[in-house]
């Protein structure tokens, strides 16, 4: 399916598919262990960094991780607020605000629909970092389409990865040299 994506439309800016996948959240437990499908060569593996551009404590890492983006870090300071029902809610101002859907969620913005709670909540993980990279890739492909440019998946991956700061240029951390470039 990925090889055939974008090949039927001759005007597509990407002649094939591009897979961007979260690297995983076991780095603090297992260290440099390859997680699949993120570790496959054609895939862009996304690690997570905290608010200070350091690898998040949980992010999987290693030479197979291609890029890092903001993923949140709950240990980077906590804040409280009062929920609509009077409860004190603790959340990290260093996590990523995301949409949530679950029955017992403590949402940033409470609401009900069909008996379930929905709204926004603060979360962390490489799955919070991955949409940042996917969004930048989508913007890049939209720009390419507007300008009549065409790329193979390998060419676009190389372009995307060459347009970010190297993580070693930004800090010297505990995972120095083990996490891909920083999406800025």
Locate predicted features.
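Active-site environment of divalent metal-dependent phosphoester hydrolases
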Residues: 26-31, 53
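Extracellular S/T/G-rich loop segment that most often corresponds to the catalytic His/Ser-adjacent loop
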Residues: 35-138, 142
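A cross-domain feature marking catalytic cores of carbohydrate-active enzymes
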Residues: 21-23, 48
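Loop/turn elements at helix/coil->beta-strand transitions in domains of secreted/extracellular proteins
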Residues: 5-9, 13-19, 41-45, 65, ...
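C-terminal subdomain of the subtilisin-like protease fold in secreted/lumenal serine endopeptidases
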Residues: 15-17, 119-120, 142-184
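Extracytoplasmic/secreted proteins, especially bacterial periplasmic and envelope-associated proteins
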Residues: 1, 41, 132-135, 155, ...
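A generic local structural motif
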Residues: 5-8, 30-34, 121
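Alpha-helix termini
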Residues: 1-15, 72-83, 144-149
């Amino acid at each position: 399916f990925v090889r055939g994506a974008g090949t039927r439309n001759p005007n597509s800016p990407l002649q094939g598919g591009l897979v961007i996948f979260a690297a995983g959240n076991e780095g603090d437990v297992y260290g440099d262990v390859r997680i699949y499908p993120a570790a496959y060569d054609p895939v862009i593996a996304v690690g997570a960094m905290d608010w200070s551009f350091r690898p998040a404590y949980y992010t999987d890492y290693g030479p197979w991780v291609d890029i890092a983006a903001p993923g949140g870090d709950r240990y980077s300071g906590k804040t409280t607020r009062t929920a609509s029902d009077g409860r004190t809610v603790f959340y990290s101002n260093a996590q990523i605000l995301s949409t949530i859907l679950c029955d017992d969620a403590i949402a940033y913005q409470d609401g009900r629909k069909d008996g379930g709670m929905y709204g926004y909540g603060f979360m962390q993980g490489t799955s919070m970092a991955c949409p940042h990279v996917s969004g930048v890739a989508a913007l890049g492909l939209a720009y390419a389409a507007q300008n009549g440019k065409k790329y193979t998946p390998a060419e676009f991956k190389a372009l995307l990865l060459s347009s970010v700061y190297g993580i070693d240029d930004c800090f010297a951390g505990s995972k120095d040299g083990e996490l891909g470039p920083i999406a800025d």
